[in-house]
Amino acid sequence: MVSANREMAVYCFDTLVSHYNNEETPPPAFEEANHPLFVTWKKIVNGGEPRLRGCIGTLEARRLISGFKDYALTSALRDRRFPPIQAKELPSLQCTVSVLTDYEDAEDYLDWEVGKHGIIIEFTEPETNTKRSATYLPEVPAHEGWTKIEAIDSLVRKAGYNGVITEAVRRRINLTRYQSTLFSMHYSEYLSYVKATRGVVGPVINGINKHAFA
């Protein structure tokens, strides 16, 4: 089974740096495979709690190399919840790559474990018959400290449902659970990797070495 690894996170940073420089992305150092995947960018300022800056991926299997290249940029630049990440933010960024596996149909909306499973919900609004769906990666409910019901209710809101969330609404949910592996890398670790493996002090963006940025 393919697991998320350091080289995947490096490739996402390479892709973003290359975008800012309008140049070709260095070739990846991980093997090709087919899996669903996500790329998450967070920003860490003054040692504080990481703040989400973008998270987008696909629940359908696709080629990892093109997938990480596409979603590294999509999550950084086109997550509609946030303004696009700017080059000057690079030194504060943390990248997390996730590879999704082990999809299973759940018996009901409670048939999953916090901290172990990611969840996909699909349901039809009782008032309008509008179809809704949304997902949380495995680490989200655990990080938020949610119970299963709290996670489900939050995900129902994420899916766009604005009505009263009753037990009847919850029982309309078709839930798919999955597992994932993830790997997180801060920009400073990326610089160390580039220096150790390529003999380069650090990427240069628009002629400015990124060590110069605050």
From Swiss-Prot:
| Name of this protein | Uncharacterized protein At2g38710
Q: Which PROSITE patterns match?
A: AMMECR1
**InterPro entries registered for this protein in UniProt:** AMMECR1, AMMECR1_dom_sf, AMMECR1_domain, AMMECR1_N
PANTHER family, sorted: AMME SYNDROME CANDIDATE GENE 1 PROTEIN, AMMECR1 HOMOLOG
Q: Which NCBIfam families match?
A: TIGR00296 family protein
* Superkingdom as given in the UniProt entry: Eukaryota
Q: Where is the AMMECR1 domain?
A: 1-194
Query: What organism is the protein native to?
Result: Arabidopsis thaliana (Mouse-ear cress)
